[in-house]
UniProtKB/Swiss-Prot annotation:
It comes from the Bacteria. Belongs to the ScpB family. Its main location: cytoplasm. The gene is scpB. The keyword Protein transport does not apply. Keywords: Cell cycle, Cell division, Chromosome partition, Cytoplasm. It is found in: Cytoplasm. GO terms for cellular component: cytoplasm. Participates in chromosomal partition during cell division. May act via the formation of a condensin-like complex containing Smc and ScpA that pull DNA away from mid-cell into both cell halves. This is Segregation and condensation protein B. InterPro entries: ScpB_csome_segregation, WH-like_DNA-bd_sf, WH_DNA-bd_sf.
Length: 192
């Protein structure tokens, strides 16, 4: 690979790493190139983003590099967040919503444990759509935030109370459960 190709891959890795970011050392290991080369490419990318009229920038904090939006464009990002949503919710968001609905109040760590993957983004999506809300903190180490469904959740799904949620099945056949879940998600994808 030449330097421009490495630059493109590093840019993609910065994007893919999201909020967690990535260290130069990690990039060096992933790309199997020297740390000096990675740092040089990061500096070039940073310069290009700063020099050109671009919407993104590379920030570094605690030796972790992040791809971020430029603060001077924040009013446009706020408009996007505040605009009515017509997009569909992801399956991850729907799964997370179901877990919260049936297990509330619940912490994000508990949601992660049930799903087997991190749920930070689905939780944020549900908060943004006002389907869930923070309801306090759990009385345990670290005092994590507890989440519950909101009044908008009840309204959106046409429920008077949480007691109107359909009961969870007791004897679960995993194959049948997956087929039914797929049908459920297909039905609500059109509505959400």
């Amino acid at each position: 690979m030449n330097m421009n190709e490495f630059k493109g891959v590093i840019e993609g890795l910065l994007f893919a790493s999201g909020d967690e970011g990535v260290t130069a050392k990690q990039l060096s290991k992933i790309l199997d190139i020297g740390l000096d080369t990675v740092e040089h490419i990061l500096e070039e990318l940073r310069f290009e983003y700063e020099r050109e009229d671009r919407g993104l920038m590379i920030i570094q904090s605690n030796n972790i590099f992040h791809l971020a939006t430029k603060p001077e464009h924040s009013s446009y990002f706020k408009r996007l967040i505040d605009s009515p949503r017509t997009s569909k919710m992801s399956q991850a968001a729907l799964e997370t919503l179901a877990i919260i609905a049936y297990r509330q109040p619940i912490t994000r760590a508990e949601i992660d444990e049930i799903r087997g993957v991190r749920s930070e983004r689905p939780v944020q999506t549900l908060i943004t759509r006002n389907l869930i809300e923070e309801t306090g903190r759990k009385d345990t180490v670290g005092r994590p935030v507890l989440f519950q469904t909101s009044k908008e959740f009840l309204t959106f799904f046409g429920l008077a109370t949480l007691d109107d949620l359909p009961p969870l099945p007791e004897n679960i056949d995993p194959d049948k459960e997956e087929r039914e879940a797929d049908l459920f998600f297909e039905r609500f994808q059109d509505e959400v």
